[in-house]
């Protein structure tokens, strides 16, 4: 199952108020583990920054979808697709569905379909 395991990376507390917590699905965790430690650390750092600031260079909504894209450019265009879970009273979660290396200007339809499938499974089995 996609959501059998989750990895929640501890983000150090910053002075600003955290707007959401990032949760990485098994697929996203697997993607991160395949990367170099430098790329992985940059992605996790940018996810932490995005949770405290509104920066469309880091985290932006994909037009016409319920998905968001976390962008990291480090020689390659790393992307994590994500969706919001606002059903908890205390924490707002952003679930990183999976990651990929972007090779074109547009986000490939197959990656959007994959994220939508993971999102559907997440809310069905939650």
PLM features per residue range, with description:
Residues 1-78, 86-94, 100-126:
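Basic, Lys/Arg-enriched alpha-helical interface segments
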């Amino acid at each position: 199952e996609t959501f059998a395991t989750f990895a929640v990376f501890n983000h150090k507390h910053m002075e600003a108020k955290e707007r959401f917590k990032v949760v990485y699905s098994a697929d996203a965790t697997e993607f991160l583990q395949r990367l170099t430690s430098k790329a992985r650390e940059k992605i996790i750092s940018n996810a932490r920054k995005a949770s405290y600031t509104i920066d469309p260079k880091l985290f932006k909504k994909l037009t016409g979808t319920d998905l968001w894209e976390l962008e990291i450019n480090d020689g390659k265009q790393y992307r994590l697709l994500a969706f919001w879970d606002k059903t908890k009273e205390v924490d707002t979660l952003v679930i990183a569905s999976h990651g990929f290396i972007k090779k074109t200007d547009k986000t490939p339809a197959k990656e959007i379909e994959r994220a939508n499938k993971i999102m559907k499974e997440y809310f069905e089995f939650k």
